Amino acid sequence: MNLPPPGIIWNSLPLPALMLDVNDRVIEINPAAELFLNLSARALKGQALGERLAISAPLEEIFARVRKNRSALFVNDVDLTTGERAPVQCNLQAAPIADDPETVLLLISPREIADRLGRASMVKSAARSAIGMAEMLAHEIKNPLAGIAGAAQLLSMGLSGEDLELTDLIVDETRRIVKLLEQVEQFGNVRPPEMKPVNIHDVLDRARKSAGVGFGAHMLIVEDYDPSLPPTLGDADQLTQVFLNLLKNASEAAKGQGTIRLRTFYDYALRLRRPDGGGQRLPLQVEVIDDGPGIPADIASSIFEPFVSGRENGTGLGLALVSKIISEHNGWISVESAPGRTLFRISLPVAPKEL
């Protein structure tokens, strides 16, 4: 079997990777690292790693031990920061190069994806059970609530003053609860997606226009698109709902006027590996970035789970629905958040050419 050239292997590595010389200066960086660090190879090459990245680990000591012992070294639970980006927890692996032991290979494994994949397999059945129970309760509770609202309306006919205000309050609150229960039922009854080749920019345009004349009228929505993106395979209506939900979250989180940036780009190296060992390339990237207050730290790790919300009157179903739809599209969604910047990234497959 003929092996591909080293350059192709290097460029195809799914993990961020860098090569450092004897002075710990960057001599090579692969495309996955450029994307993850949001820094170009031109900007990094020749630079001391510690000058461009903030890493909560003694890098000089780590690299010195690797060169001295001629063996790989693993460092877990490291916080890595570049520029204004929020810290990302990573695992690092440093190893010497066989033909040049003074050169060190550094692999970066972001913890977020690995942790979420592990959690997903454990909580999936529990979440499904919770949703099933919620659907059943919603159906059973709606009927008596309708009776309560009807009785309150009948009572109000012979009342006035403070007593009338109380019956009106009963009617308003029962309607609010019924609306919430209908959202729970809707979440559990999302139809399977009708998969067809979809231009993701058409989807984003529909969502942007709807937001601009409604809940997002006070926001500045900036488009930063790669016009060369190929179609994805998906359900245009459901994907529109995904981006409407993300735009709505960003708009509601903003204090007064804010800015939302819609960005698309192609990452040929991104591949999602599932717990069963399989995998799929997800090269189409869509980012929704806002300058709002960020996601509260105590719910950041569970923001895509049902009934988790950072807003006082939120149902906690919007992002759970987004995650569910993207999962059914064989895609992936992730989030980075800090005060002043929240980034949701959706990764999707390319539509087969024969369709």
UniProtKB/Swiss-Prot annotation:
Modified residues (Phosphohistidine): 139
Domain Histidine kinase, chain residue ranges per copy: 136-352
PAS domain mapped to chain residues: 4-71
PTM statement from Swiss-Prot or TrEMBL: Autophosphorylated.
Main location: cytoplasm
Protein's job: Member of the two-component regulatory system NtrB/NtrC, which controls expression of the nitrogen-regulated (ntr) genes in response to nitrogen limitation. Under conditions of nitrogen limitation, NtrB autophosphorylates and transfers the phosphoryl group to NtrC. In the presence of nitrogen, acts as a phosphatase that dephosphorylates and inactivates NtrC.
PANTHER family: PEROXIDE STRESS-ACTIVATED HISTIDINE KINASE MAK3, SENSOR HISTIDINE KINASE
Full protein name: Sensory histidine kinase/phosphatase NtrB
